């Protein structure tokens, strides 16, 4: 089976299928390359994502929840899917549509803001007392 999707995404169930229902659809429009500032922002998100996953995955957090601007509904992204989306954005300048998480457990997902706050608190707690007092 040949699959041209980035690692971390599930395999295409219709790959190499002559009866692929999506064959009639037009090809995905190629994305525009990211400018240097956009690349740096995505790379920073990838680095942050690695920290958040390391801090939260062992506590049962499966990934992030994001409120979609288009449909105003929450979208649940597992760590691997989000990492794949960010990598694809770096490579292609766009993210392909994907299947939403099936029957996600909302309590197992947190927001980017929660992750940032948790990481800041964890790093502050890990800092020696002298460093904590100097930052005030």
UniProtKB/Swiss-Prot annotation:
One Pfam match: DUF5319
Domain of life: Bacteria
Region spans: Disordered: 1-33
Family statement drawn from the similarity comment of this UniProt entry: To M.leprae ML0386.
Protein name: Uncharacterized protein Mb3446
Protein species of origin: Mycobacterium bovis (strain ATCC BAA-935 / AF2122/97)
């Amino acid at each position: 089976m040949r699959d041209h999707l980035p690692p971390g995404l599930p395999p295409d169930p219709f790959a190499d299928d002559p009866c692929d229902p999506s064959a009639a659809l037009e090809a995905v429009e190629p994305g525009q390359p990211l400018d240097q500032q956009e690349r740096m922002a995505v790379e920073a998100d990838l680095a942050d994502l690695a920290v958040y996953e390391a801090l939260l995955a062992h506590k049962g957090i499966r990934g992030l929840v994001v409120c979609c601007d288009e449909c105003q509904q929450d979208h649940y992204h597992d760590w691997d899917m989000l990492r794949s989306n960010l990598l694809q954005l770096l490579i292609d300048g766009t993210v392909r549509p994907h299947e939403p998480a099936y029957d996600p457990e909302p309590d197992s997902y947190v927001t980017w803001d929660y992750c940032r706050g948790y990481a800041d608190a964890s790093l502050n707690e890990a800092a020696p007392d002298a460093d904590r007092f100097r930052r005030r």
